[in-house]
Amino acid sequence: MEAGNQTGFLEFILLGLSEDPELQPFIFGLFLSMYLVTVLGNLLIILAISSDSHLHTPMYFFLSNLSWVDICFSTCIVPKMLVNIQTENKAISYMDCLTQVYFSMFFPILDTLLLTVMAYDRFVAVCHPLHYMIIMNPHLCGLLVFVTWLIGVMTSLLHISLMMHLIFCKDFEIPHFFCELTYILQLACSDTFLNSTLIYFMTGVLGVFPLLGIIFSYSRIASSIRKMSSSGGKQKALSTCGSHLSVVSLFYGTGIGVHFTSAVTHSSQKISVASVMYTVVTPMLNPFIYSLRNKDVKGALGSLLSRAASCL
């Protein structure tokens, strides 16, 4: 099949997590449950923050954005997978695959940058508490979120623009449960040097530098906490940073786990299972981490659910 000039009619085959027919109902039920929990959990976080005036602060503004990104990240991957399992049709069109590649890069970039912005917010709150509301004013908060979205859009568009010049003329089977750029590049029969170079460069810039920013912020936070004389002040500072630090550890831990698994094994099934942790499990767990470890969010959720129950 000569597909190089017919990408509009090209279809890829997503092999999924397993080709065993007996496992498909279990996989469908598991991923449907995780997706519903992800959407409901993150939606509750957004509603709790928007309905409680005490949470109308920079920290929770960034958190509501993070929850929205987590919903979108899962939505760009899981529903298509569920449809493929239910219809027993593993095909995905070239344009749908292109769209999935775009959003599967876009939302993790937003996650990375938002977590970095949140680390800076905690740094200002702990190290410069008297000037916190002056520094983290609504204009700056809006600008920071806008810049993260702009970087995500431009970076993802750059990847997609290079991908659209690729020629596919051989195997169209993707040994994964969604269209991921690295797998698409392996199927191309044209030169992918620029694509691969851009991936490594952007991974360094948008992966390593934000992590260094987070590490720097928390090193300064730790230094400030050690200098505090009040045990109550230390406890309050630790409680405000604990949930964010847990989410950062989970996000980067699963992300590094996927890259490590890809480096040490050629088993596509093992890589796919590792990717589940990064793409599905992490967005699902984030609202639980914030609601269980943050008293303000827990209280807002309790009030929201109480009001909802009284209306029934």
UniProtKB/Swiss-Prot annotation:
Glycans are attached at N5. The chain crosses the membrane at residues 26-46, 55-75, 100-120, 140-160, 198-217, 238-258, 272-292. Residues 1-25, 76-99, 161-197, 259-271 are extracellular. Keywords: Cell membrane, Disulfide bond, G-protein coupled receptor, Glycoprotein, Membrane, Olfaction, Receptor, Sensory transduction, Transducer, Transmembrane, Transmembrane helix. GO terms for molecular function: G protein-coupled receptor activity; olfactory receptor activity. It is found in: Cell membrane. Belongs to the G-protein coupled receptor 1 family. Odorant receptor. This is Olfactory receptor 7D2. It comes from Homo sapiens (Human). The gene is OR7D2.
